[in-house]
Amino acid sequence: MMNIQVVMMKQDDPRKCSAAKLVKFGLAKPVKKTTSRTLVLDPFSKKTLLKSDKKLVSSVTGIDCSWNLATTAFKKTFSGIPRKLPPLLAGNPVNYSKLNKLTTVEALAAAVYILGDSDMATTLLDKFKWGHTFFALNKNILQDYSKAESESDIVEICQEYRLPS
């Protein structure tokens, strides 16, 4: 099972923070610094997450920050292996069906799903009333992404679903 970590930037309402809820339920560990063997979810990374990345890392780390402040938050350099997620639709009530406007829990769940742990992805999302909505919107494409072996496979999948790559 993949270790789940979060760097809490504390930029959002703590009552609505999906990462804080994961920490509260013991599903994620809060960290102040990332390590070299963690996969850092970075929406500005040049490389897209692939299932083969699993052999490079021992954990997945989400950077919990406000989307409004994301460009500033990610100017900070984090140790680890940065990867962006392929295009996905948000299932959360704030950004419902917006492309790539995921909460931290949605991003972490998508990452562990693509890395081959769909049970962990379900466990993470089950703590949220709207968690099932994320899977309803993305189930088929997540299955396809989890089989992709290269960036060009991701591009083909995006074309198939008419999403920007």
Label every PLM stretch briefly.
Residues 1-5:
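Extreme N-terminal starter segment of soluble prokaryotic enzymes
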Residues 7-8, 64:
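Short beta-strand/turn micro-motifs composed of small residues
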Residues 15-103, 107-110, 114-143:
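Active-site cofactor/cluster-binding pocket
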Residues 139-165:
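Long, charged alpha-helical interface segments
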